[in-house]
Each structure stands twice: as C-alpha cells, then as structure tokens.
Amino acid sequence: VLSTGSGNVRSAVRALERVGAQVTLTHDPGRVAEADGLVVPGVGAFGAVMDQLRAVDAPRLIEQRLAGGRPVLGICVGMQVMFDRSEEHGTAEEGLGQWPGTVRRLQADIVPHMGWSQVRPPRDSVLFDGVAEERFYFVHSYAATEDPAELLGPGPTRLPRATWATHGQDFIAAVENGALC
C-alpha cells in the first residue's frame, strides 16, 4: 500500500490483511517496484492527494509499474487521480492521465453521495468476479462520468472497461485496464 499520508491508508491495510494479503505500507521506490501489487489509497481533495503523490514521487513509480505490466489498484480518490484531471472546487487540477476523462461534481439532489449503490461491471470483469451486480458503500461528491473507452476510441491499445453505479446520474465506480484498476 502506497504510504502518502492519506487518511484511509490504515483502513486499506486492514481490509487487505483481513482477506489474507501480506501488506507493506511504504513509499520506498524499491519496495514499490518489487511489490506483487500496489494499492494507491486516497481520501479528501483531488489536489491534495496529487500533492501527496508528487511528494513521494508516486507518479513516476506508478508509471514504471504500469509500463512493466505490474498491478496497480486505485481506491477512492486514489482511483480518481488516474484520470486526466479534476474540476473539484472549481479548480482544474491535473491527474496522472492514465485514463482520459475529467472528475466532476455529481449532479444529484443530495451531494455527497453517502450510501449503498448497485454496481454494473462489464461482462467478464476480473475485479468484480463473484460480486457482480452487488451493492457497495460510497462516500463521495465527485466522479468521472464519461466512459474512458469512448473517449479513447478505436486503436491499438487495450481499452479501459468501466464499472458503473448511479446517484442522480451514472458515474464510474471502477475501471479495469490491464494492470491498472
């Protein structure tokens, strides 16, 4: 688990340990590079999480892992920063650019979205294997709402596959894209 000072790091560590994972909390470049998988947690404002990631050279470390086909999982804002940018709090903030798209405020009667929502994963989802069409708990005010595969269009690259949920509008709950989820 990437250590950045983010508020939900301990929750991510405990959840992974509960399902039997051997977890190391680190931002050491060697350990990040050698890990079987890397979890990028994040809670709070998009810009603050990007600042935390830059402070530990995480953009470069994540890029190196992905270039080598090594798994990376973003959770919460850790997933949102994988998109091109955010318009959180009316300020344009650059993300890591792994997926095209912009994270924007949800268009719903009640924001933040705090509650259970059913997810709709793509067919043959690896990430949601065995839990397709289940309900998951969300706490967020911002989300990407444009399918990254549609923004990319046809080409030689493997297209990202979005899992969707709804709160006032459809939003991306997760993305599977080879080694990046």
Where are these regions (language model features)?
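Pocket-forming structural segment of enzyme catalytic cores
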Residues: 84-166
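An anion/phosphate-binding loop that grips the pyrophosphate of nucleotide cofactors and donors
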Residues: 35
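Cysteine-nucleophile active-site neighborhood
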Residues: 44-116
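Structural alpha-helical scaffold elements that stabilize or flank donor/cofactor-binding regions
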Residues: 31-32, 65
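A glycine-centered loop/beta-turn motif at secondary-structure junctions
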Residues: 157-158, 166-181
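Structural motif
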Residues: 39-41
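N-terminal beta1-alpha1 ligand-phosphate binding loop
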Residues: 1-21
